Curated annotation (Swiss-Prot):
GO terms of biological process kind: proteolysis
Keyword GTP-binding included in the entry's annotation: no
Cytoplasmic side: 1-109
Catalytic activity: Release of an N-terminal dipeptide, Xaa-Yaa-|-Zaa-, from a polypeptide, preferentially when Yaa is Pro, provided Zaa is neither Pro nor hydroxyproline
EC number: 3.4.14.5
PANTHER family found in the cross-reference section: DIPEPTIDYL PEPTIDASE 10, ISOFORM B (PTHR11731:SF200), PROTEASE FAMILY S9B,C DIPEPTIDYL-PEPTIDASE IV-RELATED (PTHR11731)
Primary location class: membrane
Compositional bias of kind Polar residues: 10-22
Pfam families for this protein: DPPIV_N (PF00930), Peptidase_S9 (PF00326)
Annotated active site: 768, 845, 878
Cellular component GO terms, alphabetical: fungal-type vacuole membrane; plasma membrane
Protein name, per record: Probable dipeptidyl-aminopeptidase B
Length: 921
């Protein structure tokens, strides 16, 4: 379920910390925006002339003068200031009038008395009126979204704006590449107007003090090329390390979430001509292709078999022969792509270019799940005669919880010997109990680190393999179940640190995320077989997908962390010996930062993602002699748009449930009045290790609800979510949904008790894991707090979801049958106690299968429960996009919620026909 908070990415806040890990083809996917980055840099250099750049953080207008507050007391204070401003204008007017000497003092006193009596009577009448209104049932006062008060020129956030991406901040990605001779600060630039199609720029040329820089280098002059009379257009590009060739993918066809098929071509930079990757199979659909670090060969997978093409010869060498429907080589199957690698590659070159590590996946025992397509034919194949009216069925090997997993082996290929071999190491897991989650080559040493866990992800083994000697050993073994009862998250952030005795590093080593006193921190293991790390970070905070980069020249490690707050992100550095911890970003103000470093860590693209308008700049790191800063994106258009619209007031605070402090954000309507009674919608995701409450900027569906409809929207990250310590995270193990639902309910009770909340109009909604949590909360609450719920693509029984994700948090069903019974949505009588709920699902969902919703409907039918609505979307997967479906999802949520808070569903329980007026017949 990796990445699910972003299923509806255009509607959610940017860079919530479920950021997906980059796959091996990240260069191709990001190169196209680098041109904009470099154009911005060039514009600023031209504008500044010889002016020396500084590292000053640019200041940008906030989303609104009072759009943010840290707690309720701060917000009340701000509202009082607003009222004082209004009173001061009146005061000034009255003062001017009081200077008129001609007004008799007695007359003036009489006027004041009469005015006071009038105002007192008006206030009393208003109080009586409001008092009567307060006792009206919500259904008697329908909410009119168009009647939300508006002052001045402020506009409401609209659904069209949100759905159309108009509130998305412009954000550029940089494709940093390493030069052929190790140069740092090189960018791959693709598709820039007025420039050649694919070029390499040197960011160092933008610094007046830079020396030894490279001239702009053209890799591809045009955005098209010809091979054997065919005109081809690049979809993805992968330059060789020596920058003499470009591997080009065309005719890309999507497979699963990350993987795709394509035709590949080798483009020669000098001659500007191309040839097919495989000269004897021009139309072969290749699943994955990657360069040798020495730029002299390409390894690729086709039809689940691996091949090697050396540039010195047109001949393609077949590495494996038994790949097919049940055996995968070098690419992951569905569950490994989704839950382990979050990418399309299971192939790893060593830096010397002499060896390739790759995964062999055996799916022969994995059951198949049929995904049906009733409208489209994703295979692209015409049906057989007579089968035109039957749906297309795609059988996917999908291991559900407790079912047989694919078995995996790590194999190696010796290029000089053209030999595949395996290194067996004693003390490992049984094949049916083994997950291989990460492979990291130790540079050019011929050694590799392999991270393995058992099936339930609570026992970790790190293995060091020497492929030259063809031997290996276990260097770390940790039973996390004994440590805190939790699990190991999948990670691919381990960083190899080569030995450099002259620079204070006598041995090779690696940096890994470790558990230290309830939090995730960085440890430096050196030598590589040392099981006790040098602790680089510590404290009641966590590192996030760290390290971000390592400056080997200066022994500096860069990382993002939650040191200032669980809901912010700042960039820090620390020395390899664990000393000299420094903040790189300005921690005196709140910020939610991301960073993308150049290959040598001398430069970084710094992304400020909130709480105010996002911006980006390229800066040199502190140890770089060529110091400069260039802003590449300010999002002025977004800032102007924010000024013209009335955005929700965001109140960040915490609640304590069962001794755990939980992060909450409340989105109030722009003209919030504490004397009114507001409906409240809770929005959640809540998956293990996820985070929804953050200080990142985002105007999404929740913002629309608060701004346009005038409802309050609350999000609480309950137990099980990330960045608040492992104790709060791991308490859910074996019983997911229980504590998370309790946290939603207890927080909702706090809101229900607030004077400005209409406790009879409270709803909750979520997608994917959030859909499961919506139903689980309604089930546990049984109508006591929440009256309504909306669940999109929900899991309803964790026995239906994939094994690797589910068993990490629940163990296997064989190990924990009672836990699976508890977590399933089965108490439908409790669901019947809610006023009404809505369920929506994509019929072709290959992730959370439609089986989940259909099984729930059957339970509801058996129990005679009818207080719900259902909408299914033909041929839509988990993101629900097919044939305008995504817009329908949000229109449905919008209209259904308005009807709920208008009390429409209160009138459906015992519907009676209207009397027929004979006069109108």
């Amino acid at each position: 379920m990796a990445g699910h908070p972003e299923e509806n990415a255009q509607l959610l806040s940017t860079e919530q910390e479920s950021m997906s890990r980059n796959s091996s083809d990240s260069v191709a996917s990001t190169a196209s925006t680098t041109s904009l980055v470099f154009d911005r840099i060039g514009e600023r250099v031209a504008a500044n002339g010889s002016e020396k750049p500084t590292m000053v953080t640019p200041k940008f207008p906030p989303r609104g003068e009072r759009a943010y507050a840290d707690d309720e007391h701060t917000q009340i204070h701000l509202e009082e200031e607003e009222e004082k401003d209004y009173d001061m204008e009146d005061g000034a007017f009255l003062t001017n009038g009081a200077t008129n000497k001609s007004v008799d003092k007695k007359l003036r006193r009489l006027i004041w008395i009469i005015g006071g009596v009038f105002i007192g009577a008006w206030v009393l009448a208003l109080f009586i009126f409001l008092g009567k209104q307060a006792y009206k049932h919500s259904s008697e006062s329908p909410h009119d979204p168009q009647a939300t008060s508006s002052r001045g020129s402020g506009k409401k956030v609209t659904m069209d704006q949100v759905m159309g991406g108009q509130w998305r901040a412009t954000k550029h990605s940089i494709s940093w590449i390493e030069g052929a001779n190790g140069e740092d600060g090189l960018l791959l630039e693709q598709g820039s107007v007025g420039k050649d199609y694919l070029i390499v720029e040197d960011v160092r040329t933008q610094s007046p003090s830079a020396v030894g820089t490279l001239d702009t280098m053209t890799l591809m002059k045009n955005g098209y090329f010809e091979v054997a009379g065919r005109s081809l257009t690049p979809s993805k590009v992968y330059p060789s390390k020596d920058l003499k060739k470009v591997l080009v993918a065309t005719d890309v066809q999507s497979n699963w979430r990350h993987s795709f098929y394509a035709k590949y071509w080798i483009f020669d930079v000098e001659t500007q001509t191309a040839e097919p990757l495989d000269p004897v199979d021009l139309d072969g659909r290749v699943q994955l292709a990657s360069w040798s670090p020495k730029s002299d060969a390409i390894v690729f997978t086709r039809d689940n078999n691996m091949y090697l093409r050396k540039l010195a010869s047109p001949t393609v060498v077949q590495i494996t022969v038994d790949g097919g429907p049940e055996f995968f080589y070098g690419v992951p199957d569905w569950v490994y792509e989704e839950e382990v690698f979050a990418g399309a590659s299971a192939t790893w070159w060593d830096d010397s270019g002499k060896y390739i590590a790759f995964l062999r996946t055996n799916e022969s025992e994995v059951p198949e799940y049929p995904v049906q397509y009733f409208v489209s034919r994703p295979s692209g194949k015409d049906p057989l005669p007579g089968e035109e009216n039957y749906p297309e069925v795609r059988e996917i090997k999908y291991p559900k919880a407790g079912a047989p997993n694919p078995t995996v082996d790590l194999l190696f290929y010796d290029i000089s010997k053209a030999e595949v071999f395996e290194v067996k190491i004693a003390g490992g897991f049984e094949p049916k109990d083994l997950l291989i989650t990460e492979v990291v080559w130790a540079g050019s040493t011929g050694k590799a680190l392999i991270r393995e866990t058992n099936r339930e992800s609570d026992v970790l083994r790190v293995v060091l393999v020497d492929v030259v000697a063809r031997e290996g050993k276990t260097v770390r073994f940790t039973d996390i179940a004994k440590l805190d009862g939790g699990w190991f998250e999948v990670s691919e952030d381990t960083r190899y640190i080569p030995a450099d005795p002259a620079n204070g590093r006598p041995h090779d080593g690696y940096i890994d995320t470790i558990i230290h006193e309830n939090y995730d921190h960085l440890g430096y293991f050196t030598p590589m077989d040392n099981s006790e790390p040098i602790l680089l970070t510590s404290g009641d905070w966590e590192v996030v997908k760290a390290p971000s980069a390592v400056d080997l020249k200066n022994n500096i490690v860069y990382f993002i962390s939650t040191k200032e707050s669980p809901i912010t992100r700042q960039l820090y550095s620390v020395k390899l010996d664990g000393t000299d911890l420094k903040a790189i970003t300005d921690t005196s103000t709140e910020g939610y930062y991301g960073a993308s470093f150049s290959k040598g860590a001398g430069y970084v693209l710094l992304n400020y993602n909130g709480p105010n308008i996002p911006w980006q700049k390229v800066i040199s790191t502190p140890s770089n002699d060529n110091q400069y800063t260039h802003i590449i994106e300010e999002n002025k258009g977004l800032a102007d748009m924010a000024k013209k619209h009335e955005l929700p007031i965001l109140i960040y605070q915490t609640v304590t449930v069962d001794g755990f402090e939980l992060q909450v954000v409340e989105r109030r309507p722009p003209h919030f009045n504490p004397k009114k009674k507001y409906p409240v919608l809770f929005y959640l995701y809540g998956g293990p290790g996820s985070q929804t409450v953050s200080k990142s900027f985002g105007v999404d569906f929740q913002s629309y609800i608060a701004s346009n409809l005038g409802y309050i929207v609350v999000t609480v990250d309950g137990r099980g979510t990330g960045f608040i310590g492992r104790k709060a995270r791991t308490i859910i193990r074996g019983n997911i949904g229980h504590y998370e639902a309790r946290d939603q309910i207890e927080t909702a009770k706090i809101w229900a008790s607030k004077k400005y909340v209409d406790e009879s109009r409270m709803a909750i909604w979520g997608w994917s894991y959030g859909g499961f949590m919506t139903l689980k909360t309604l089930e546990q609450d049984a109508g006591e707090t929440f009256s309504y719920g909306m669940a999109v693509a929900p899991v309803t029984d964790w026995r239906f979801y994939d094994s690797i994700y589910t068993e990490r948090y629940m163990h296997t069903p064989q190990h924990n049958p009672g836990g699976y019974d508890n977590t399933s949505i089965s108490d439908v009588k409790s669901l019947a106690k809610n006023v009404r709920f809505l369920v929506m699902h994509g019929v072709a969902d290959d992730n959370v299968h439609m089986q989940n919703t259909l099984t729930l409907l059957d339970k509801l039918d058996l129990a005679g429960v009818e207080n719900y609505d259902v909408h299914v979307f033909p041929d839509s997967d988990h993101s629900i996009y097919f044939h305008n479906a995504n817009r329908i999802v949000y229109d449905k949520l919008n209209n259904w919620l308005i009807n709920a808070f208008n009390g429409e569903w209160l009138r459906t329980a015992n519907a009676v026909p209207l009397e027929i007026d004979a006069a109108k017949v």
